[in-house]
């Protein structure tokens, strides 16, 4: 028997997924159902693009609902208090700089479900986060990049 996959995430990330799920169920699902009923009233379904479009959207929304339910049911909430205050871990925000003299960058380390690099959130599965997790402020870390080379970064700060 296979184990269910768990999804590491912050409580905030789980709450965002829950809100998305509630919106899909309460708003989008009924709206699509109405559109399907209206499109059916147009007659012949074989050449009814409105009907086909609504059915395609319904399939997408139903799939997303199932995915969200699975992720929420199997969420592993990250406890950033379980590690030392100055240690990089899931749920913490880390500031680092590429050596020798790049500008500091700050990212929150989150589960892959929440990752959004443009919003300053990187996945714990990314090469950068993977190299930083478990390290402490002041340490220099070699981060292997996908192209085979590595860069050295210095951890400047860690916060919750």
From Swiss-Prot:
Keywords from the named record: Coiled coil, DNA-binding, Transcription, Transcription regulation
Positions of disulphide bridges: none
Coiled coil: 49-77
One MF term in the entry's GO annotations: DNA binding
GO biological process, one term: regulation of DNA-templated transcription elongation
Signal peptide: none
Matching InterPro entries: GreA/GreB_C_sf, TF_GreA/GreB_CS, Tscrpt_elong_fac_GreA, Tscrpt_elong_fac_GreA/B, Tscrpt_elong_fac_GreA/B_C, Tscrpt_elong_fac_GreA/B_fam, Tscrpt_elong_fac_GreA/B_N, Tscrpt_elong_fac_GreA/B_N_sf
HAMAP family in the record: GreA_GreB (MF_00105)
Protein task: Necessary for efficient RNA polymerase transcription elongation past template-encoded arresting sites. The arresting sites in DNA have the property of trapping a certain fraction of elongating RNA polymerases that pass through, resulting in locked ternary complexes. Cleavage of the nascent transcript by cleavage factors such as GreA or GreB allows the resumption of elongation from the new 3'terminus. GreA releases sequences of 2 to 3 nucleotides.
Family: Belongs to the GreA/GreB family.
Protein's UniProt name: Transcription elongation factor GreA
